[in-house]
Amino acid sequence: MQISSRSGFGYFSYGIRLALTPGIRRFVVLPLLANIILVGGAMYYLFSHLDTWISEWIGQLPSFLSWLSYVLWPLLALTILATFSYFFSTLANFIASPFNGLLAEKVEQHLSGERIGEEGVWALVKDVPRILSREWRKLLYVLPKALGLFLLLLIPALGQTLGPIAWFLFTAWMLAIQYCDYPFDNHKISFHDMRNTLKQNQSKAYGFGMLVAFFTSIPIVNLFIVPVAVCGATAMWVMEFKTQHSPLRQ
């Protein structure tokens, strides 16, 4: 099946079509269930506390910047939603990572017509330790940067103005890494090489990640994002990156 090159936004939209494709849909179910359970519970908790958190945070602004509260409230709300959703989506992805990898494999097979690896339950079970190790590698990459940005948020005025923008861009980048990594990992391409490939294609990576971050912050919609993002990221791999790494395939 031939697909044309798209923008990062375009690959996300294409992911919706792929997730609904016959032959792919049955591999969407388990990642979808993990996301609904964890993110759904997190969103319920978040919305019961969101107004209080934002009011307390804006209250730290100096009085001469109080006029910014009208601008910052929606920006902070979006940032908190995106960050909260990213955290719990990451947890859901960690738990469902073997099934996300399987979904990426089936999408690539659908798009390229090539068999990617061994099939069957035993093949999936054998891959679980490697897949979970890869998820830990992502967490080790994320945590120091997330801590630095959290400290930025604690700086009066600066944290309330530049902090939300920095968090949104960081979330977009990390979501691009999170979902694009599944097809890379299926081909045993190192995390370092995957990250460098995305750095060389930042417009597509950020475009894709921003759209995932935006929809991840929308209640109800965010429950269905994981399989869509896996499908879209796999389409990006097939069209944009696969030929660059063909000598590395095993």
Curated annotation (Swiss-Prot):
Keyword annotations: Amino-acid biosynthesis, Cell inner membrane, Cell membrane, Cysteine biosynthesis, Membrane, Sulfate transport, Transmembrane, Transmembrane helix, Transport
Q: Where are the transmembrane segments?
A: 27-47, 64-84, 150-170, 210-230
What coarse category fits the chief subcellular location reported for this protein?
A: membrane
Q: Does the keyword Cell membrane apply?
A: yes
A biological process term (GO) from this entry: cysteine biosynthetic process
**Topological relation to the membrane, as annotated:** Multi-pass membrane protein
Compartment(s) of residence: Cell inner membrane
Query: What Pfam families does its record include?
Result: EI24
Q: Which GO terms describe its molecular function?
A: high-affinity sulfate:proton symporter activity
Q: Which domain of life is it from?
A: Bacteria
- PANTHER family referenced in this protein's UniProt entry, alphabetically: SULFATE TRANSPORTER CYSZ
> Which NCBIfam families has this protein been placed in?
PRK04949.1 (NF003433)
Q: Which family does it belong to?
A: Belongs to the CysZ family.
Free-text function comment from the UniProt entry = High affinity, high specificity proton-dependent sulfate transporter, which mediates sulfate uptake. Provides the sulfur source for the cysteine synthesis pathway.
> Could you tell me what this protein is called?
Sulfate transporter CysZ
